[in-house]
Design a protein with these regions (language model features):
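C-terminal helical cap and adjacent loop that interface with cofactors, partners, or active-site loops
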Residues: 19, 72, 300-400
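A structured beta-alpha segment of the ubiquitous adenosine-cofactor-binding alpha/beta core
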Residues: 81-115, 129-138
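N-terminal export signals
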Residues: 1-16
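A short, Lys/Arg-enriched amphipathic alpha-helix followed by its capping loop at the start of a domain
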Residues: 39-58
Length: 400
């Protein structure tokens, strides 16, 4: 399957004079302290560090909130900052008028009381939000850029629907994890267009909620390889009790495993002696022949990381940082890409990366539930051209 034909990504460059702030709407599940709504929209309202300082050239003019828990912040923030708190998504985009009155939309379907399915997916209303946003654009005859927090779907059928709708509308569309642009320890990456001989990914926490972060972080490194990205041919999910067997079979590169485990705060013996029953050992078989194990190790690993051996023989391992100060800064770097898209009309980097990893995770969760069967993924042969995009701290928040 080729790329989905959404508006092409462009890399940002340079510094410049202060631009006019673009008005944006936001559609969120909940708005409470330290929610994704807070750590993204709060940076529009209060600056990159959420301390009243400089921030993006965006203005939040309207907000739709789907659920109002006791700890809701949106009502008081609307009074303080003057944005419109809306009863419908259409109102958020039109400000109650007869036209699209904003230049961009942030859709944040994360947190809140929503059901789970039998595959362990938390069914946030990301498709419903996206459908109502794009229905409103169609109704009023104007398309503006949309950012979807985390992965589309989360079910693959819904992610595919969203991709097709974006293609039909020629919608500038971004999605994905803040961890792809976060700080790394150590600060290392695969050189642009370097070949990859082997790789290992490590994740922690829930298979759905943090599996997507793990897969997308790994993908933002692997997409840089010399073959470009041609997509995924098959996936399989095994129990963590099979990790020792996978090592014996050569499915996991031994040195890379040790490097990746050390980078994420654990070690081989801790994992092999007591593999977490609520984890999983994922295998991702790429179209170009690369097969990558991704081990989800809740209670063992202390973070998300990867170890890579490139075709020169160089080995490196890195862990993504999830800093809390100054107020979850990786979300500032995510917001920087969103700001770029809203000002240029072009995604800062390809949505296909997130779409691919969303599909990989969905199929892996199915494999895990259905007796660990290997799944041929003809629908994940998603080819795309990556962007040589920076991550913290190499991305300038004051760049225009």
């Amino acid at each position: 399957m080729a790329g989905f034909g959404c508006s092409s990504a462009v890399a940002g460059t340079g510094l410049g004079f202060r631009r006019e702030k673009k008005p944006v709407a936001a559609v969120v599940t909940v708005y409470r302290q330290k929610s994704h709504a807070d750590v993204l929209l709060g940076k529009i309202l209060q600056g990159w560090k959420q301390d009243g300082g400089e921030g993006p050239d965006l203005e939040l003019v309207s907000l739709y909130v789907d659920q109002y828990p006791a700890e809701d912040m949106s009502v008081e923030l609307a009074k303080k900052h003057g944005f419109r708190l809306c009863k419908t998504i259409q109102e958020a985009l039109t400000l109650g008028g007869d036209r699209i009155a904003v230049d961009g939309v942030l859709s944040i379907g994360e947190h809140g009381e929503y059901p789970w399915n039998d595959f362990g997916q938390h069914l946030y209303p990301r498709k419903r939000f996206f459908q109502e946003i794009t229905d409103t654009m169609t109704k009023y005859g104007r398309v503006v850029p949309v950012f979807n927090d985390k992965h589309p779907g989360p079910q693959w059928k819904d992610a595919l629907w969203m991709a097709q709708r974006a293609k039909e509308l020629n919608l500038p569309w971004m999605a994905g994890s803040s961890l792809t642009v976060s700080y790394r320890s150590p600060d290392d990456d695969l050189p642009w267009r370097q070949g990859v001989e082997a790789a290992v990914g490590i994740g922690y926490s829930g298979l759905d909620i943090y599996g997507i972060h793990t897969l997308e972080f790994l993908q933002c490194i692997l997409e840089r390889r010399s073959t470009g990205e041609q997509g995924v041919a098959w996936v399989q999910a095994l129990p963590t009790s099979k990790i020792g067997w996978m090592l014996e079979q050569g499915l996991i590169h031994s040195e890379l495993l040790d490097r990746a485990l050390v980078a994420t705060g654990t070690d081989r013996q801790a994992v092999l002696n007591d593999p977490p029953a609520d984890g999983a050992a994922f295998l991702v078989g790429y179209v170009d022949g690369l097969v990558v194990p991704v081990l989800m190790l809740p209670g063992r690993a202390q973070g998300i990381g990867a170890a890579i051996k490139d075709q020169t023989g160089r080995v490196f391992a890195t862990r993504v940082q999830e800093r809390e100060e100054p107020y979850y800064p990786h979300f500032a770097y995510l917001l920087k890409g969103i700001e770029q898209m809203i000002h240029t009309g072009k995604p800062a980097y390809p949505v296909e990366r997130t779409l691919l990893t969303a599909g990989v995770l969905d199929h892996l969760l199915i494999s895990l539930r259905e007796n660990n069967r290997k799944i041929e993924t003809h629908d994940l042969r998603i080819a795309y051209q990556p962007i040589n995009y920076a991550y913290a701290p190499h991305l300038r928040l004051d760049a225009h």
